[in-house]
Amino acid sequence: YIFVYGRIPGYKNNRRPQTMDREPPVSVVVPLFSEDYSFVEERLPLILAQNYPDFEVVIVYVGHDSDFYEDLARLKQSFTQITTTKIQLDPRFPISRKMALNVGIKSAHYECMVFTSTDAVPQTDRWLSLMAKGFMRGEIVVGYCGVERRKGFANYMMRTGRMMQSAAWIARAVQRRAYRGTLHNYGFTKRIYFGANGFSHLNMNIGEDDLFMQRVMTRDNVSVILSPRATLREKTWGGMGWWMSQLRYY
């Protein structure tokens, strides 16, 4: 146990050799699958307020509400970092998360991209800065996302379960045997993505943070960002029943 997990507390990504001499501009890609005003009003501002000089936020809206999309696009008047794109929702042709990410990647203006979800909340304004710094030492960057702290035993079990699940793949990553990340907090370059011909099985709603990552991760191209200032917390939408439904992604 100590041999496998004991390296996590002392791991420092800055021991790895640099491949860039400065932090790159970054595109933050966020797929949005509903008319989620709580994301727009509460969590999006935390992304836009990141303490980083050169970044954009690419929001891929999957839906059919033209008024909502116009409100979303209008935000660019106040926040020039925002780029929006829309995929028209058609019940006959379901749109997977990987399809939305594929559109977001093609819409991104920068080579280095960080991916998150509408449910994830940055814990500090240094999150993006630290994730971007990871690209100086690897073309793939993985970070941690916990579960928001709330009252109750169910929430305690959720937070503990997330920590244990994440410790398994983080331990392998710091040993230079990375095999996955978390869909709420990871990144890679366009060169990595298009060099691997993108996601496979675009119609499947799983695999972007594990199956794809297994194809492109090597011993030398992964940066692991473990600073508490670079963590996110996932918003919960229910109790243990909701949590068990989320475990299918692990």
Q: Where in this protein do the model-derived segments appear?
A:
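Acidic donor-binding segment of Leloir-type glycosyltransferases
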Residues: 44-91
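Catalytic donor/gating beta->alpha subdomain of glycosyltransferases that bind UDP-sugars
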Residues: 140-142, 146-165, 194, 199-250
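Long helical/loop segments within the catalytic core of UDP-sugar-dependent glycosyltransferases
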Residues: 84, 88-96, 100, 104, ...
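Cell-envelope/extracellular polymer assembly enzymes that use nucleotide-activated donors
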Residues: 24-27, 56
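Active-site acidic Asp-centered loop
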Residues: 62, 116-119, 144
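Acidic donor-binding/catalytic loop of UDP-sugar-dependent glycosyltransferases
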Residues: 118-133
